Amino acid sequence: MRVLVTGATGFIGSHVIRELLKRNHQVIATSLDKEGLERFDWYDKVEYVPYNIGPATEENLYTLFKEPELLIHLSWAGIPHFKDLIHLKNVGDNFAFINNLLQNGLKDVTVVGTCLEYGMQEGCLKEDMETRPTTPYGLGKDCLRRFLEQTKKE
């Protein structure tokens, strides 16, 4: 399977890529930090496509990223500054990015959320719990999830 991984140089992204390669998937990695990407032992086993997730573009991102079958979306600007208002801007940018891929042929998407979508709670969290974000980061991730769920229904 051809898998596009955003946020490839992040902690989660680097481990996801390693596991995908172990399972013999073709990986397309994107990140703004090519030098950071080159430090991983798997760098020469992936296709690197530099891209900055920003405002909506008319460019066909599905073609740019060589027609992936699955997107694993891990990229998110502004971490670890959880109270920064950039997280509210991220909602539109990330939705436009994912929607462009879907509109142009992508069939399968996995987006990583955050425990902060549930607010400041103690104990185990479950997916069926009500979300109550209290930070711009949690709110941004929760809004993106809701927009994507609505898009799926349409």
Regions found by a protein language model. Give the residues of each.
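Conserved Rossmann-fold NAD(P)-dependent oxidoreductase catalytic core, especially the SDR/UDP-sugar
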Residues: 73, 95-135
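Catalytic Tyr-X3-Lys loop
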Residues: 81-95, 99, 133, 139
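Active-site Tyr-X1-5-Lys
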Residues: 134-154
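Structural motif
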Residues: 2, 69-70, 108
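N-terminal Rossmann NAD(P)H-binding glycine-rich loop of SDR-like oxidoreductase domains
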Residues: 3-23
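Conserved catalytic-core motifs of eukaryotic protein kinase domains, centered on the activation segment
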Residues: 40, 80-86, 120-125
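Conserved glycine-rich Rossmann-like NAD(P)H-binding loop of the short-chain dehydrogenase/reductase
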Residues: 25-34
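NAD(P)H-binding glycine-rich loop region in Rossmannoid oxidoreductase-like domains
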Residues: 51-90
